[in-house]
Amino acid sequence: MTDRLAPATLVFREDGTLVSPAYGDIYHSAAGALAQAEHVFLRGNRLPERWRGRRHFTIVETGFGTGCNFLATWAAWRADPSRSERLHFVSVEKHPFSREDLRKAARHIVAGTTIDASLVDELADAWPMLTPGLHRVELDAGRVVLTLAFGDAREMLPSLVLRADAFYLDGFAPSRNAELWSVEVFRALAKLADEHASFATYTSAGDVKRALENAGFSYRKVEGFAGKRAMLVGEFAPRWKLRRHEPPRAFDADTRDAIVIGAGLAGCALVERLAARGWRVTLIDRHAELASEASGNRAGVFHPLVAIDDNFGARLSRAGYQYALSRWRAFEAAGHAFSRSREGLLQLACDEPEFVRMQAAADALGMPDELASLLSREQAGEQLGSETAQGGWFFPQGGSLDPTKLAAAACATAGERLTRLANVEVARLVPREGGGWLALDANGATLASAAVAIVANAADAPRLAGLRHAPVQQVRGQLSMLPAGSAPKVALPVIGDGYLIPFADGSALTGATYEPDDLDPIPREAGHRENLVRLAALLPHAQVDSNMLADPASLKGRVAFRCVASDRLPLAGALGDEAAAAANARALSGAQPRDLPRASGLYGAFGFGSRGFVWAWLAAELIASQLEGEPWPIERELAEAIDPARFLLRALRQGRVG
């Protein structure tokens, strides 16, 4: 289970210096936090000159604290007309401040300086929920990307996937927080370093110098800040080979263009994330409209999963949920609307034993209320506006939305960078001479050509990409539309074994059946009946129209097909080269994911099951980051859990390839 976070406590000394009661140390010099950041970390890393003319520049920091180093760097980047296109700032923090404490601390730091206080508010407004793991925060219209790693540096740093250009070695003094300055931490940083990546730190302690040298960094002493005799600067310059695997680089292509096949949420999220980085995208779909298949329901629900062991599925859903919310807020701020409900979402326990398990998870995980809180039966009924048989989880930022409108909003943000080919079916993907991919129709005619191809067309993706080791199946789901006046009256979407989504006109949506390998596209009376029985079990005290129960065939409905992987996790990322793996199967029998050969320029995003809302944007951001050589938005172990080549890897380890 992921360790719960212990937030920092905001305490000021009489001289206005921030202090940590837990470590008995100050957050910054009494001579000025921002001046210290500029002297030690910016000048110490030869910034801003080193980021000039770059597509992106990546800084890794140990100890976010009050954010003063980040704010100083952001301000310097904004002021530089020759700045990099994008600035990535990745920071590890074991004890993050709450949103409002961060706002107070940062406002105090920038008061009386040249830094615009609006930067503090933009940062605080985007500050994530205090949950363990990685959090992607996009600022300055997406040009500045802050990736926060909440947790112990010794655990978080090895989980990062990135290539660092500079390191800010901050944090409390080595005498107060020795583990942050250990050989273990510096070796983890060394695995992330680009050739000759720089570092700077305010300390010149002997143990720190020895640990840096041990990890492959060279150093020299320079004048410290505010009368401090010395500080250390240096670079990654190992005298021996330290790394089995090199940090990731950007995909090598002459052009930044991609073919995305499938215009559901997975494909439209990819369009948005790639276009935001300047890529040109051709979106191909066999239907005339966006989101016409599994993403085409009138509404769907979104919420994270909660599990007492905080397994991969729970962690991925939490990360995807929070990242999706941040992207949707950006769409809404730009004027796009997609009927996102605002009342929250209620997940009811099916019975008393399940509620007891929920209580155990709540006690073990200690989640912040803005993520989820556990309500008693009485509290749940009050929240829902209807009596319930059990309590359950309340997700205040969960809810429902219109997937078709969301897909349209995502594509609208791409503007002229998007080319749509509708009513077109891709029969084959073939390698392009000289690199890249061609999408061909059934007659062999070229539909599109690009450096990169991404299959996001659900259950047909393995066929199109030529994957033998991608076990997905189609699961039929039938939902039922309940006419106005016939549905139970509830104040917000409610789920359990089934769901009910209310609409403003008094109608509602309920469902859905779960029928593996049933490919009948026509709604059936039996499906409506099953949905009504499930609704009655979900809300046993609610009134359901007796006429509807007597004649379920009178209901309107819709059938869609979920694409579900055998391990119930999505497939997102670079696809494996199965032919190359088969040719080298014996050598790869003990391989790690990073050892597998990959099909150059071929990626996938499919197998989202019923969780397209939660997983689509995280998967798209992961793929875009892989293509650009940017820091990944999730931990390595989570990326490997959804790696499309994971099934190939298992087959190799079991001797089933070749």
PLM regions and their residue ranges:
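Helix-loop-beta segment of a Rossmann-like dinucleotide-binding subdomain
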Residues: 113-116, 308-311, 337-347, 371-412, ...
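C-terminal catalytic lobe of FAD-dependent flavoproteins
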Residues: 546-658
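Flavin-dependent oxidoreductases
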Residues: 310, 435, 439-533, 538-556
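N-terminal Rossmann-like FAD-binding beta1-loop-alpha1 element of flavoenzymes
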Residues: 256-283
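Glycine-rich FAD pyrophosphate-binding loop
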Residues: 276-296
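Helical element adjacent to the flavin cofactor pocket in flavoenzyme catalytic cores
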Residues: 393-442, 447-448, 452, 456
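The AdoMet/dcAdoMet-binding core of the Class I SAM-like
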Residues: 51-164, 183
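Dinucleotide-binding Rossmann-like beta1-alpha1 core, especially the glycine-rich loop
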Residues: 300-383
